[in-house]
Amino acid sequence: MVTGVTAANMTNVLGTAVVPAQLKETPLKSDRRSNKPIMEKRRRARINNCLNELKTLILDATKKDPARHSKLEKADILEKTVKHLQELQRQQAAMQQAADPKIVNKFKAGFADCVNEVSRFPGIEPAQRRRLLQHLSNCINGVKTELHQQQRQQQQQSIHAQMLPSPPSSPEQDSQQGAAAPYLFGIQQTASGYFLPNGMQVIPTKLPNGSIALVLPQSLPQQQQQQLLQHQQQQQQLAVAAAAAAAAAAQQQPMLVSMPQRTASTGSASSHSSAGYESAPGSSSSCSYAPPSPANSSYEPMDIKPSVIQRVPMEQQPLSLVIKKQIKEEEQPWRPW
């Protein structure tokens, strides 16, 4: 038994043993408290980012305008997401059932039983009964002839409309289009396809740029290819001949020359020339002179040198038209200032 240790010493010993443990626990708690707001902030940021991505995906999937649904609450976004996933799940289940051969066989068997019961209905005319049974058989086989024919006709019409050239904006463009592709105007559309005037079959093909082109089949015999080339050459020759005839007709048309406007100088010149001309009214050997060039409108009478164009016999004119008119010019007095 130790009797020399006092109470104060005992407290010092206990204090020295307990204090290090408390010092070790306090830093961990302080670190957790300081890191907790940061972790909470990061967690909220992740949630908000995921919600924003969900909103974008849901609006794109449901084909809604993002401008009208820019402000969606978090609950709305989650609700729309759940509904969309449920719809996708139902669609996948329906597709799996439709692809399952057992379910398909069961459906066909039930449909066949219904058709048999329909065929037993009393009071139906034989023609109407046949049409009804034919319609039901087409439905069970998945063949809808009328709808298929309508879709095919619409596709053919759209292809034919795309193959036709656009209307020209000028006669030159029209002639160029006719010379470049004369075979486009002779294409015949039938139920079996498209045919050229010489009987060649062509296949409408969509090019990478989106336009439609008529392509010859690869299995075309060499003789038919030669015939097609000869036909195209003949069409081009006809187009060139038509263009040459149009150019020749345009050259044969008379050209119209614009007459110059009368000015003071031209009026005086014409008065002098008319005075000399009126002196011989009955002469049959008089010449007609060409008018001055319109390019030089401001000229002097002395610079004019008329050129003889042709001799035209003049007819006898009345006396009142050939009498020379005397113009009295008043002499102005001379003033020195």
UniProtKB/Swiss-Prot annotation:
Keyword terms: Developmental protein, DNA-binding, Nucleus, Pair-rule protein, Repressor, Transcription, Transcription regulation, Ubl conjugation
SUPFAM superfamilies, alphabetized: HLH, helix-loop-helix DNA-binding domain (SSF47459), Orange domain-like (SSF158457)
The keyword Nucleotidyltransferase is annotated on this UniProt entry: no
Motif (WRPW motif): 334-337
Record GO terms (molecular function): DNA binding; DNA-binding transcription repressor activity, RNA polymerase II-specific; E-box binding; protein dimerization activity; RNA polymerase II cis-regulatory region sequence-specific DNA binding; transcription corepressor binding
PROSITE patterns: BHLH, ORANGE
Orange domain span: 107-136
Region (Disordered) residue spans: 146-178, 259-311
BP GO terms, sorted: cell morphogenesis; membrane organization; negative regulation of DNA-templated transcription; negative regulation of transcription by RNA polymerase II; nervous system development; open tracheal system development; periodic partitioning by pair rule gene; posterior head segmentation
One GO CC term on file: nucleus
Pfam families, alphabetized: Hairy_orange, HLH
Record PTM: Ubiquitinated by Topors.
Low complexity composition bias: residue spans: 263-301
Region (Interaction with Topors): 29-48
Record's subcellular location: Nucleus
SMART domains: HLH (SM00353), ORANGE (SM00511)
Comment text on domains: Has a particular type of basic domain (presence of a helix-interrupting proline) that binds to the N-box (CACNAG), rather than the canonical E-box (CANNTG). The C-terminal WRPW motif is a transcriptional repression domain necessary for the interaction with Groucho (gro), a transcriptional corepressor recruited to specific target DNA by Hairy-related proteins.
Subunit-level organization: Transcription repression requires formation of a complex with a corepressor protein (Groucho). Interacts with gro (via WPRW motif) and Topors.
Physiological role: Pair-rule protein that regulates embryonic segmentation and adult bristle patterning. Transcriptional repressor of genes that require a bHLH protein for their transcription (e.g. ftz).
Name of the protein described by the UniProt record: Protein hairy
UniProt organism field: Drosophila melanogaster (Fruit fly)
